[in-house]
Curated annotation (Swiss-Prot):
Any one Gene Ontology molecular-function term assigned to this protein's record: proton-transporting ATPase activity, rotational mechanism
This protein's name: ATP synthase subunit b 1
Function statement: F(1)F(0) ATP synthase produces ATP from ADP in the presence of a proton or sodium gradient. F-type ATPases consist of two structural domains, F(1) containing the extramembraneous catalytic core and F(0) containing the membrane proton channel, linked together by a central stalk and a peripheral stalk. During catalysis, ATP synthesis in the catalytic domain of F(1) is coupled via a rotary mechanism of the central stalk subunits to proton translocation. Component of the F(0) channel, it forms part of the peripheral stalk, linking F(1) to F(0).
Keywords: ATP synthesis, Cell inner membrane, Cell membrane, CF(0), Hydrogen ion transport, Ion transport, Membrane, Transmembrane, Transmembrane helix, Transport
Main location class: membrane
Subcellular compartments: Cell inner membrane
Subunit (UniProt): F-type ATPases have 2 components, F(1) - the catalytic core - and F(0) - the membrane proton channel. F(1) has five subunits: alpha(3), beta(3), gamma(1), delta(1), epsilon(1). F(0) has three main subunits: a(1), b(2) and c(10-14). The alpha and beta chains form an alternating ring which encloses part of the gamma chain. F(1) is attached to F(0) by a central stalk formed by the gamma and epsilon chains, while a peripheral stalk is formed by the delta and b chains.
Originating species: Albidiferax ferrireducens (strain ATCC BAA-621 / DSM 15236 / T118) (Rhodoferax ferrireducens)
Signal peptide: none
Entries under InterPro entries matching the protein: ATP_synth_B-like_membr_sf, ATP_synth_b/b'su_bac/chlpt, ATP_synth_F0_bsu_bac, ATP_synthase_B_chain
Disulfide cross-links: none
Organism ancestry: Bacteria, Pseudomonadati, Pseudomonadota, Betaproteobacteria, Burkholderiales
Family indicated by similarity: Belongs to the ATPase B chain family.
Ranges annotated as spanning the membrane: 7-27
Membrane topology recorded in Swiss-Prot or TrEMBL: Single-pass membrane protein
Amino acid sequence: MNINSTLFLQAIVFAILVWFTMKFVWPPITKALDERAQKIADGLAAADKAKSELSSANKRVEAELALSRTETTARLADADRRGQSIVEEAKSKATEEANKIIAAAKVEAEQQSNKAREVLREQVAALAVKGAEQILRKEVNASVHADLLGRLKLEL
């Protein structure tokens, strides 16, 4: 191998090529690579942020669902209590109404019983007068003996 001037010339051309590449070609390539790396890093950061937002949204949804379930349970329990109170109120009103009806029936029965007793007393008094009249064979004046007949009614 002969070392001659072409080898030196080729070395100089190669050095110029390296310098030209380092000065004009390499910076846009590194800039493009850096931009691409930044885009990838931004995308990964956005993905992580979206993932954390999704996680927090899921937690909020779960909290809302739990709150909704609690409210629904409370409303159902409240409705059940209201239903029970309405039923109890209806029962008490029905019992009260039945007691009123029974009391009215007792009062009416007592009045009818008293009326029947009075009618019977009058009939017994009339029968007693007729019986006494027949026994004595003498007419008895009812107006004269009203006091006697009144006592007789009370005794009966």
